[in-house]
Amino acid sequence: MFGNSRVPESVQGDIHPHLATLLDRHAGAPFRKPYADYNRAAFAGSLERWQRTAAGSPVILDSGCGVGESSLYLARNFPDHYVIGVDQSASRLARGRRSAAQWPPNLDLVRADVVDYWRLLREAGIRLDRHYLLYPNPWPKASQVSRRWHGHPVFPSLLDLSGVLECRSNWAIYLAEFCFAVRRMTQRPAVAESYAPDAAMTPFERKYLASGHR
C-alpha cells in the first residue's frame, strides 16, 4: 500500500564495524575500473549540452534520479543553475520525460552509470555547486556494506566533486554511516538530521512521508 512502506530491516544496529577499514583502503587505492563506452558517450553528450545551452552556469547533479521528478523540481527551484539528472534506467528516464508538462531549459536527463559519471566529472575538473543523493538503495544486509555509496571504492571520487552534498534516506543507519564516511575522508562536518519537507521531491519520498518516516 502507498502509505505502508517499511524502514529497511537489518541486523546492524549501528555504524558497520568494518566501515572505517573500508574507507581507509579506498582512500589509499584509486578506483581504476575501466569506463564503459556508453558512459563515456553519455558524459560527453551531457557536457556538450551544458556548454552549449548554459556555459558558466553552476551545476547541480541529481544522482540516481529515477523518473527525474526530483531533477525537474531542482531545475524549477534553481533557475540560475544547470541541473543534470543521471540514472542507469532508460525506461525510468523516458517515463519521466513523458510525464513532464513543461521541460525547463536548464534540465538534462542522462542515461549513465553514476560510478563512471562521477569519475568522468572529476577527471574533467568539473566541480558541482550542489549534489543530491535521494534515497539510494540502502543495501541493508551487513554483508552489503561495500555496495552502499559510502562503502564503495568510488566514494573518494564522489567527494572530490565538492559542492553542497545532500543525501536522504529513510534508514537512519545509512545516514549515520554516510556522515561518518564524509567526516573521515574530508575532515569536514557532516550532520544527519530529521527532515520533513513541505513537498516530496521523489516518488519514494512521497511514499515514505505517507508512511510516517522521517
What are these regions (language model features)?
Residues 1-59, 70-76, 100-125:
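S-adenosyl-L-methionine
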Residues 63, 86:
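Conserved beta-strand/loop positions that form the S-adenosyl-L-methionine
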Residues 64-68:
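Class I SAM-dependent methyltransferase "Motif I" SAM/SAH-binding loop
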Residues 89:
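Conserved SAM/SAH-binding beta-strand->alpha-helix loop
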Residues 96:
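Conserved SAM-binding loop
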Residues 162-169:
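Conserved beta-strand signature within the Rossmann-like core of class I S-adenosyl-L-methionine
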Residues 176-181, 185-214:
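Class I S-adenosyl-L-methionine
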